[in-house]
Amino acid sequence: MAIDGWTVALQAVNFLILVLLLRHFLYRPVLAMIDRRKAEATRLLDDAALRVEAAKAERQKAETLRADLEAQADALLADSRARAGKELEELRTRARREADGILAEGRKALAEERRAAEADLRGKAAGLAVEIAGRLLAAATPGARVEPFLDRVCTRLTALPEPERQVLAGQAADGGIRIVTAVPLDEAGRAHCRDRAHTLLGPDIALTFADDPELLAGVELHFAHTVIRDSWRDLLGRIGLELDGHDDAHRIA
């Protein structure tokens, strides 16, 4: 088979034209599209990488924030526990202090009640002792002589300072003296009383006489505003007061 040169040349020209046409209408657009797709893929990859980095940064921030929050929570919890422990200790201390105060007040009140009861019992015991002694004395010495008691009263009057004796003399001059004895005095006893009173306070002193069995024995001189006593009732009363006072002083000591 013979090959014509012009045919070959025409075929070559056709091939070149086809290549040019394919290059212009197919290859270049395909390459351009590939480049665009490649660029878009690169952009997407870069954007994804940026997003991954941003996500990592956000995650790191979240981890840091979580760690900070946990640290703050631990600090707040520790502070709350410390405050709660301190407040609890303060409450315990206050409760102990209040309890001690209540106990102290209770002990004080109990001690005061006990002292009052003891004082009341001592007073009753002293009063009972004095009453018993008075009854025994009244039964043992009926009608005891008044002269020794009157002599002691006169001795006390004599021992008074002059201003006080003048005051008593003025009261006697104005209102007289009432002489009270445990039993009624006979005329001799009254005469003895008049003699002693007139000697001490003046001859013009008015005297009246009375009797009071509760004196047990002794005498009382009643002036207008003053009473001078020397009797067993007065003595027993002073003994009772001394007994009670002695018990109080002994208890306080």
UniProtKB/Swiss-Prot annotation:
Has keyword Ribosomal protein? no
Membrane spanning stretches: 5-27
Its main subcellular localisation, reduced to a broad class, is membrane
Q: Which CDD domains match?
A: ATP-synt_Fo_b
Q: Where in the cell is it found?
A: Cell inner membrane
Record's keyword terms, sorted:
ATP synthesis, Cell inner membrane, Cell membrane, CF(0), Hydrogen ion transport, Ion transport, Membrane, Transmembrane, Transmembrane helix, Transport
Report the membrane topology from the UniProt record.
Single-pass membrane protein
Fetch the InterPro entries from UniProt.
ATP_synth_b/b'su_bac/chlpt (IPR002146), ATP_synthase_B_chain (IPR050059)
What Pfam families does the record tag this protein with?
ATP-synt_B
Hydrolase keyword on record: no
Q: Which GO molecular function, any one, fits this protein according to its record? A: proton-transporting ATPase activity, rotational mechanism
Provide one Gene Ontology cellular component: plasma membrane
| Top-level taxon of the source organism | Bacteria
Task: Explain the purpose of this protein.
Answer: F(1)F(0) ATP synthase produces ATP from ADP in the presence of a proton or sodium gradient. F-type ATPases consist of two structural domains, F(1) containing the extramembraneous catalytic core and F(0) containing the membrane proton channel, linked together by a central stalk and a peripheral stalk. During catalysis, ATP synthesis in the catalytic domain of F(1) is coupled via a rotary mechanism of the central stalk subunits to proton translocation.
Subunit structure as annotated in this protein's UniProt entry: F-type ATPases have 2 components, F(1) - the catalytic core - and F(0) - the membrane proton channel. F(1) has five subunits: alpha(3), beta(3), gamma(1), delta(1), epsilon(1). F(0) has three main subunits: a(1), b(2) and c(10-14). The alpha and beta chains form an alternating ring which encloses part of the gamma chain. F(1) is attached to F(0) by a central stalk formed by the gamma and epsilon chains, while a peripheral stalk is formed by the delta and b chains.
Family, per entry: Belongs to the ATPase B chain family.
Name the chain's protein.
ATP synthase subunit b 1
* Gene transcribed to yield this protein: atpF1
